[in-house]
Amino acid sequence: MTEAMKITLSTQPADARWGDKATYSINNDGITLHLNGKDDLGLIQRAARKIDGLGIKQVALTGEGWDIERCWAFWAGYKGPKGVRTVMWPDLDDAQRQELDNRLTIIDWVRDTINAPAEELGPEQLAQRAVDLLCSVACDSVTYRITKGEDLREQNYMGLHTVGRGSERPPVLLALDYNPTGDKDAPVYACLVGKGITFDSGGYSIKQSAFMDSMKSDMGGAATVTGALAFAITRGLNKRVKLFLCCADNLISGNAFKLGDIIRYRNGKNVEVMNTDAEGRLVLADGLIDASAQHPELIIDMATLTGAAKTALGNDYHALFSFDDTLAGRLLTSAAQENEPFWRLPLAEFHRNQLPSNFAELNNTGSAAYPAGASTAAGFLSHFVENYREGWLHIDCSATYRKAPVEQWAAGATGLGVRTIANLLTA
């Protein structure tokens, strides 16, 4: 058996022979990471990527200075989408070790689920994986309902049915109730709504291959809110929370939806489809209608919704939108506490009116006259939230997935956002 490479921490700079910018050095005892006191977590994560790039697949984190956040930063950079890596963790107290184990179980589940090929993870499989994860942490407190295919149309989930009907794999709505109180009449504290597009071709507004090749990850919002609920439960969540996952493929077929179609939603809104590649908001609308009907204190939806958010923030931050300044501030505080990157982008009342249609109340996409695509998408969603000015957060989760490796992340899913939402739920 190969001996694990020892990884130690030092606050001293590397020997000058390694260069004045060296973040790690190698010696007979192993590898030393040289912290600078400025961005130690980032330095550890980037160094872990380099260590993985050396082909080292077994490591032992030894010596002083390894706390849970430094351990987690190392794993965030060290984990990759293929191959097996083994880490011998340092001694942590019981609470930190339990927290680390929960992160390894749940956030790795999120990353692995997002990375799964679309052929292996259709709408039904995604919903079932979510159920299995949540049952593994709190099965006695979980009930759920799966509605799929033509049952969605019969129950007036017209956005989800319309988008998903073009695939041989039927669209699915997962409605899951986490109720630790044991009281079936207990108020719902929060609702989480996730976009679960298990593959997005763009439909008849078809994507180019360069934009389609990562679209197995278009269910990143659904995976992240599922992981967030599971993680919050491990941190002691004792309030009732409902989860709505809107799962579908967006494909081309003789039965697929078309430009010019009009979708009539249960809340009375009519939407003209002028871009079948703006499908995420169409499925989320159904989930938000259900969430609003619960009258919770808090609604959070999460979706890989727009390229505009990615243009603004890259893959480095999740974009946050809200009319509720106090609530937005609370989420940003949670993000800072969890060392996760969120950035608030504008959402104003006028964005709700920048989706004009000649044939319906709303268009599902903005025109060239209204180019703020991420903000108008959030404005669209607000039409399906009963009290949109209070208690609602929309997260356009552009940091869930990377098509190519960078200095701190392997290619694929990141798991970012799970800790922040869990923090907010348990604050």
Swiss-Prot record:
Looking up PROSITE patterns in the UniProt record yields: CYTOSOL_AP (PS00631)
A Pfam family reported for this protein in Swiss-Prot or TrEMBL: DUF3663
Keywords of this entry = Aminopeptidase, Cytoplasm, Hydrolase, Manganese, Metal-binding, Protease
Instruction: Tell me which residues bind Mn(2+) 2.
Output: 195, 200, 218, 279
The keyword Protease belongs to this UniProt entry's keyword annotation: yes
Q: Any binding details for the cofactor?
A: Binds 2 manganese ions per subunit.
UniProt-annotated binding residues for Mn(2+) 1: 200, 277, 279
Q: Which Gene3D superfamilies match?
A: Zn peptidases
List cellular component terms (GO).
Answer: cytoplasm
Compartments reported by the entry: Cytoplasm
Which E.C. number(s) belong to this protein?
A: 3.4.11.23
Q: Which GO terms describe its molecular function?
A: manganese ion binding; metalloaminopeptidase activity
Coarsely, its chief localization is cytoplasm
Q: In the UniProt entry, which residues are flagged as the active site?
A: 207, 281
Which cofactors does the annotated protein need, by name?
Answer: Mn(2+)
Catalysis performed (reactions): Release of an N-terminal amino acid, Xaa, from a peptide or arylamide. Xaa is preferably Glu or Asp but may be other amino acids, including Leu, Met, His, Cys and Gln
Q: Which GO terms describe its biological process?
A: proteolysis
Matching NCBIfam families, A to Z?
PRK05015.1
Q: How does it assemble?
A: Homohexamer.
Q: What is the stated purpose of this protein?
A: Probably plays an important role in intracellular peptide degradation.
The record's family statement is:
Belongs to the peptidase M17 family.
The protein depicted here goes by the name: Peptidase B
Q: Which organism is it from?
A: Salmonella dublin (strain CT_02021853)
